[in-house]
Amino acid sequence: MKHIAAIATAWLVMALADLPIMVVQAPDSPVRLDHLKVFSTDDAPPVLLYAATNVTDNQLDQFTVTVFVFDPDGNLKARQLAPGRRTLDAHETKYSAMVLDVGTIAPTDSLMAGVDQAQRVGSDQWWRADLRALAQQIVTSRKR
């Protein structure tokens, strides 16, 4: 019975990974997002699964992930921010998830996610980037 449940779960996960998403990253970002997958069902908001890697030699206390949804004309339709995993050691990778509670996402929409701020352990200063401008450039260049 456990074998059947495992197969059914694996099939369900593969069937639900149907919304493509791109990474938008500032050149000097201390955190890199990889392995992004958006899972959705008809009766629940989509969920983003991602791997976050600290690309620095310093321990990070916290970071923020931002997801952008653009319509087919390149207009920003929605934006959602969420805290990432707490404490990423130097060069460490951790997986996390984010519920995308941004309303309806059409199959023709473009989704992008990235890290727009991070803070080192023991520091009051934040690294920040304007990912919206970068994401808008990508969407505009893809439209041409």
Which stretches of residues belong to each language-model region?
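Positively charged n-region of N-terminal signal peptides that target proteins for export
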Residues: M1-I4
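Bacterial N-terminal signal peptides
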Residues: I7-A15
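Low-complexity, acidic Ser/Thr/Pro/Gly-rich terminal tails and inter-domain linkers that flank the onset
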Residues: L19-A51, V55, A129-D130, L134-K143
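Hydrophobic beta-strand positions in extracellular immunoglobulin-like domains
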Residues: A52-N54, V69, L100
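Short, acidic/polar linear motifs in exposed loop/turn regions
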Residues: N54-Q59, D73
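Short, hydrophobic/aromatic beta-strand segments
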Residues: Q59-V65, L76-L81
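Intrinsically disordered, low-complexity Pro/Gly/Ser/Thr-rich segments with frequent PxxP/GP/PP motifs
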Residues: K77-A106
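Terminal connector regions
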Residues: D101-R144
